[in-house]
Amino acid sequence: MSGEPQHLVLVVDIANVMGSRPDGWWRDRAGAATRLLAELEPLSGAEVTLPELGAARITEIRAVVEGAAKRVKGPEAVSVLRADGDGDSEIVEETNRLTAAGKIPLVVTADRGLRRRLPELALIVGPGWLNRLLGR
C-alpha cells in the first residue's frame, strides 16, 4: 500500500446543504448559493478522513444547483452543474458518470430518496459533515 490518499470527487447538493442551516437563505437563494460555492473552493485538494476509506483527497468539486440558484457562477475550482429539471436527477446522473469513469464520488446530501437512487459505489455524507469541514 502506497499510503497515498484515495482521490474523491465531491458532489454537493447545494439546495440541501443551504437548507440545513436556518440562516435566511430563503430570502436570497442565489446569494446563498453563491456564498456556499465560494466556501467550497478551498476544499479543492483538501485531505479528509472518512470511515469507509481513511485518508482521502478531494481532487474535484461538483456543485449541483437548481431553480433560482441556476444563474449563479462559481469559483474556478468548483464545477457548477445547472439542473435542467430537479437537482436530484442531475446528482444521480453525475454520480453515475463519475463511477463509470472509475472515480469515487462523495455526495453531500441528507435527502433519503436521493441517497437510495445513488450508485452503490458512491460515498455519502450529510450536510453536517460538510458544514463542520467548512467551519459553519
Residue ranges and their predicted role:
Residues 3-4, 17-136:
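Nuclease catalytic cores that cleave nucleic-acid phosphodiester bonds
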Residues 8-13:
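Short, hydrophobic/glycine-enriched beta-strand segments
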